[in-house]
């Protein structure tokens, strides 16, 4: 059985530099390798599903307030994440002590400058210091015996705050 390493970086309101067009600043790029949206209904042969596994649990996690502080090569299979924290998934960053909770009943907590998302907000805004937080997650897992013979295997994310990329075994496989 192969061991798979699943990684994803979550980019909130993301851009890495104002001069470069990134996927999250291009309104024509809403996804890469994503299946069409649909209801999450999965038939099972038995009460305990034999065609899905849950990856909820403890993941390795690293949070940064700005993209420039992220680790760009964190997705490589030989990357050492021993200094990263153990983080529950699913979970909210702010509830777990990373970043500042933002509640806006009207308006936006960031500078409106489409398609750029890193414009400097007002000094009093929370996003002035946490311009574009990035969460990086890592987890290793094994597919059950026989799954590779099935052909395709799908990942389903049931809640992500904003844009994210997914890597498996060091290879970028998607963006949403």
Model-derived features with residue positions:
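Accessory beta-strand-rich segments of carbohydrate-active enzymes
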Residues: 22-31, 35, 46, 60-64, ...
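Accessory carbohydrate-binding/adhesion or oligomerization-edge regions at the termini
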Residues: 18-118, 173
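Bacterial Sec-dependent N-terminal signal peptides
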Residues: 1-21
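Generic structural signal for beta-strand residues in well-ordered domains
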Residues: 11, 52, 77, 146-148, ...
């Amino acid at each position: 059985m192969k061991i798979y390493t699943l990684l994803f970086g979550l980019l909130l309101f993301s851009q890495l530099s104002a001069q470069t067009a990134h996927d999250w600043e291009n309104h024509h790029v809403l996804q890469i390798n994503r299946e069409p949206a649909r209801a999450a209904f999965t038939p099972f042969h038995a009460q305990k599903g034999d065609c899905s596994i849950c990856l909820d649990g403890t993941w390795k996690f690293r949070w940064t307030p700005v993209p420039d502080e992220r680790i760009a090569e964190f997705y490589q299979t030989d990357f050492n994440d021993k200094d990263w924290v153990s983080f529950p998934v699913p979970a909210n960053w702010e509830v777990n002590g990373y970043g500042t909770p933002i509640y806006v009943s009207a308006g936006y907590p960031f500078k409106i400058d489409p398609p750029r998302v890193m414009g400097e907000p007002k000094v009093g805004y929370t996003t002035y210091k946490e311009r574009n937080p990035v969460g990086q997650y890592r987890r290793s897992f094994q597919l059950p015996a026989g799954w590779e013979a099935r052909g395709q295997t799908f990942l389903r994310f049931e809640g992500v705050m904003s844009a994210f990329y997914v890597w498996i075994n060091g290879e970028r496989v998607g963006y949403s």
